[in-house]
Structure formats: C-alpha cells, structure tokens
Amino acid sequence: GGKTVTVAKAMAVAQPQAALVHYAAEHKKMATIGTEQSLVIDPGSRTFDWLVTRGMRLVQKQSHSINRGMSDVLRLLAAEISKDVGSPYRDYDAIDLALRSGKSPVIFQKPYDMGRHLPLAESVAQQAVSTMRQWIETPESLQNIILVGGGAFLFKKAVKAAFPKHRIHEVKEPMFANVRGFQLAGQNYAASAIAPGRDRGAGEIA
C-alpha cells in the first residue's frame, strides 16, 4: 500500500567530498571553491579518511582511508582504564563524553582522572595524520584544509602540527558535515536536472 518512487538518475559522492560542499556553503565560498585546491580530513568512528581535490574533482592518488578512527581511541583507552582499575571497563560512550567535555567519567562511584591517558589518545591521532601527510605531494599548494567528522576535536592538534603554516578550517557540528553536504549536493543536482538544457556534473556545485 506504499508509494512507488522511480529514480531517474543517481549521483555518487565520496563522503569527505560531501563535507567540502557543506564547508563551501557554510563559509560562502560556492563561487570560488571550484578553482581552489583543498584537503578534507575526516576522522570518523572507524576510519580516518582524507580527500584532496582540485575544485570539486578528486585527486585519487593523494586521497585515501586508514583504520584509525575514534573507535580505536576508545578501545585503547578502555583497555588502559581496565588495567588501572583492575576490572574490565567497556563504557565507550562515557570515555567519548569525557574526551569531548573534559569532565571525568564516574567509575565505581568515583570520578576517574583521564588526564594520564590523553597522550595515548593523541598518539593515535598523530599516527593517522603522519600517514596522511606522506600522501600529500604539494601541501604548499593547498588553499583549504578542512577538518570535519566526529573525531575532529581530538585530531585537530595533530593536524595543526602537520600543517603549521596553514589555517585549519572547521565547520559547525563537524559530525554532520557529510550528511548536510549530501543533502545540498542532491538538491543542486535535482535543480540542475529540472532546469532546461542543463546536465550538471556530479561534483559541480551550483
């Protein structure tokens, strides 16, 4: 008894590329982003992704993804806490909240000082960013370095250290940068499909 929807055309957009669309819209760079070279860095839950673009075109040989996401950080810290308290500890949500808020999680009814484990968390970010840096051939040519994703807050320090002469751009609510970019790209694509005589490319921004 439901509705039937026919999809006439589909558009594939890489996840960090959608974040670039969102960044351009939020920072009012829609008119200029198409001529600029950008690096989009997306530390997510399970993977650490990065994308180099010229305009909106992907530079495949400089873009990649590795298994170094926030889940790796949380599991590593949980293992250290478990050894410290002498009991298995797997409250990943509590660890995540503590990292984001700076407030101590409560373990066995007592606030637990996470400070001693922060260098360990930062080392995961440093390893991921160091790997990415080896893929970037001409960092001096990057006009935009954009940090998005749920792990942006933890990886920011390592990213800044890797690109000390660049300004690192951020967006509001970086966790939702990709999904908002997907929506905007879809809306632009739909509008171009409706407009007579237009057939906008998948990566082009209106």
For each feature predicted by the language model, list its residue ranges.
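Nucleotide/phosphate-binding catalytic cleft detector across ATP-hydrolyzing
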Residues: 1-38, 57-71, 84, 93-145, ...
